[in-house]
A protein has these predicted regions:
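Glycine-aromatic-enriched surface loops/turns that form tight recognition elements
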Residues: 2-78, 82-152
């Protein structure tokens, strides 16, 4: 498993709602004060879009992916909180429920958060970009898509 982000050119993109500023493989979330990897784990930024095969991981494997991202990209990458991931949902967008100009080629599927469901501690919260809704029903051994985030 490898996480690769290629930076070919410096480009800036601004979302219509001015919540996000995208620069190469990083997206700055002005509302949450965090930086997102523009691509899902398994994909890489080619200067114009996210390319490659998305890798679905369970919670244990996501720890290894985070270590690898920190080695390759530097910084303190992590799984997002439920609230952070909910903040990038675009309810006005068609499926996937995310701004594709900022987060291209995002699958319309559930994404892991790093947050345990306090009402059902065996489950982890996820945000589904097919529906735009949050669910606290996935078990840690299930494989879901992940997008990494770090504090600014």
């Amino acid at each position: 498993m490898g996480i690769v982000c290629s930076i070919l050119t410096t480009t800036l993109a601004f979302a219509n709602n001015a919540q996000f500023i995208a620069k190469d493989h990083i997206v700055i979330d002005l509302q949450s004060g965090v930086e997102w990897l523009r691509c899902s784990v398994g994909q890489r930024w080619d200067g114009a879009q996210c390319v490659g095969e998305i890798v679905k991981l369970n919670q244990e494997m996501s720890i290894q992916a985070i270590k690898l991202a920190n080695e390759q990209l530097g910084g303190n990458w992590r799984l997002p909180t439920r609230e952070e991931l909910e903040n990038i949902v675009c309810q006005e967008c068609s499926r996937p429920k995310i701004d594709a100009s900022i987060f291209p080629n995002t699958p319309a599927e559930p994404f892991w958060t790093g947050e345990q469901n306090q009402y059902s501690p065996r489950h982890i919260w996820s945000v589904n970009f097919f529906t735009g809704h949050t669910y606290g029903r996935f078990m840690p051994f299930q494989d879901l898509v992940i997008r990494l985030v770090r504090d600014r």
